[in-house]
């Protein structure tokens, strides 16, 4: 379910949990496609037989997990009056647990700050990628974006 707010009121959400995404399964196909796109073909990700033998199965790339943030966050916050938004960067990223192929992940998002910047509003979000059935998250990232209103 999406949280709704007007562009002028987005700062009222600071300190609040924005929402939790649906679960998404990490498939070997997704891992292989990420390996192709990035050139990262390390065996722990793409050599299923060796990974099964040596580490209990293949794991997703940390950066694949991180790259899911825009997809998992889509629809969590609907800011009325926004004409465009851009990714601005990250302050902190930590990979705290590996995601095994076949597991499901979701994102929990909290708005940490909303500050005027370059004619827009810079949003700082804490994005926690959770693994179904695991206590420790896969990734915790503090992301920055800038939204512009009409």
Predicted segments with their positions:
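HotDog/MaoC-like acyl-thioester-processing domains
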Residues: 1-13, 99-150
